[in-house]
Amino acid sequence: MKFIDEVSISLASGRGGPGCVSFRRESMQARGGPDGGNGGKGGDVIIRTSRHINSLVDIRQNKRYAAQSGRMGEGRQKSGMDGEDLILIVPQGTVFRNMDGEIIIDMTGISEHTLLKGGRGGKGNEFFKNSVNQAPEHAQPGEEGQEIEVRLELKLIADVGIVGFPNAGKSTLISRISAARPKIADYPFTTLTPNLGVVKAGDYSSFVVADIPGLVKGAHAGVGLGIQFLKHIERTRLFIHLVDASGMSGRDPLEDYTDINNELKMYDENNQDKEGFFPLSTRPQLVVLNKIDTLSESQLTKLKKQFKEASGSEPFAISAVTGKNIKEFVQELARQILKEEEE
C-alpha cells in the first residue's frame, strides 16, 4: 500500500429535513387540524481512529465527504428520519488543520470526536398551531449543515525515533530488535517510507520504534529525500542517533553526527512558528555506533572517546548485522524511555 501522510478534503454535515405541512383527514370533515411532523436531524461528521491503518491513502480517493441530510417530516405528526452520520476513520496521530494551518483537532490520544454537527430538522405546521392560528399553513425549513475544508496530516505515534544518514543501518536495526521487516539493501535511500516496529524489552514491557528515511547534509533544503518525514518522529520521547562507525563509504562518523544534528536544528527553525510543533534538536538522544564488527578494538576505543567528547555522554556500540550488544542496547533503551516517562 502506498504511504500517504497528507491530504486535503472538504467535510460536510447533513442538512436538517424540512417540516411538513399536513392536515388531518377525517370523515365528515374535509380538512382537520394540522398534523405535520418535524424534519429529521442531519447527520454528524464523526472522526474515529484505528490502530489498524497507518496511511491516509484511502481518504485521498475522494475530495469531499458528506453526512446524510435529514428526511422531511410527514403527516400524522411523524418526524422525518435522521440523516446517517459520516464516520471518517483515520490513523492514530492524525492532525486536522484548517486551511490557515491552525489545528482543529489532534487525534493522538482520542479515539472518537464529533467534528461537525448536523443541522436541526425544521418544525412541522402542527408545532405552530395556537389559539389565534388554528390551521397554520407553513412549516420550518431544515437547518443548514456545516462544511469545512481541512488538511489532514499524519504524524506516526512512536516512543523512539531512529535518525541517521542513509546506509547507517537503521532498517537492519529495527528488523533486528522488532518484528518489522523493512526493505534492506546496500545502497542509499532503501527506506522510502517510515517503518514502525514493536520492541519487547521483557515479559511485560514493550515500546514502539519509528525508522524514517535517512537524512543527508542539506536535507532541510530538499537534498536527498529532504526532511518531509521528520514530522513522524515529533511525538517520540527520544531518538536513537545511529552512526555508521565503519567509515567504509569514505564518510567521517563524527561529521555525520554533526550534520544530522544541524539538520534537526534547521528543521526546528523552519517550523518553530507552526502550531502544535514539537522541537527535535532538543530531544534526548542515545548515540549509537553501528557496524562495530568492521573496527578493531583500538579503533572503537578511539571513536568512542571522540563521541563522548562531542556529545557529552558515552555512546553505545553495536553491530545490527551480527547482533553484538543488541540485548544490552534494548535494555538501555527501555531504561531511557522509563526515565523520560518519569520526568
Curated annotation (Swiss-Prot):
Q: Which residues form the OBG-type G domain?
A: 158-338
Q: Which organism is it from?
A: Bdellovibrio bacteriovorus (strain ATCC 15356 / DSM 50701 / NCIMB 9529 / HD100)
An example Gene Ontology CC term for this record: cytoplasm
Function text: An essential GTPase which binds GTP, GDP and possibly (p)ppGpp with moderate affinity, with high nucleotide exchange rates and a fairly low GTP hydrolysis rate. Plays a role in control of the cell cycle, stress response, ribosome biogenesis and in those bacteria that undergo differentiation, in morphogenesis control.
**Which Pfam families does its entry note?**
GTP1_OBG, MMR_HSR1
Q: Provide the protein name.
A: GTPase Obg
Key word Cytoplasm present in the record? yes
Q: Where in the cell is it found?
A: Cytoplasm
Q: State the Gene Ontology terms under molecular function.
A: GTP binding; GTPase activity; magnesium ion binding
* Residue ranges of domain Obg in the record: 1-157
Which HAMAP family does UniProt cross-reference here? GTPase_Obg
Name the residue ranges with Gly residues bias.
Answer: 33-43
- Entry's EC annotation: 3.6.5.-
Record keywords, A-Z: Cytoplasm, GTP-binding, Hydrolase, Magnesium, Metal-binding, Nucleotide-binding
A single Gene Ontology biological process assigned to it is: ribosome biogenesis
> Which cofactors go with this protein?
Mg(2+)
Binding residues for GTP: 164-171, 189-193, 211-214, 290-293, 319-321
Q: Where does Mg(2+) bind?
A: 171, 191
Q: Which PROSITE patterns match?
A: G_OBG (PS51710), GTP1_OBG (PS00905), OBG (PS51883)
Location of the region described as Disordered in the Swiss-Prot/TrEMBL record: 13-44
Signal peptide annotation: none
Protein family membership: Belongs to the TRAFAC class OBG-HflX-like GTPase superfamily. OBG GTPase family.
Per UniProt, subunit arrangement is: Monomer.
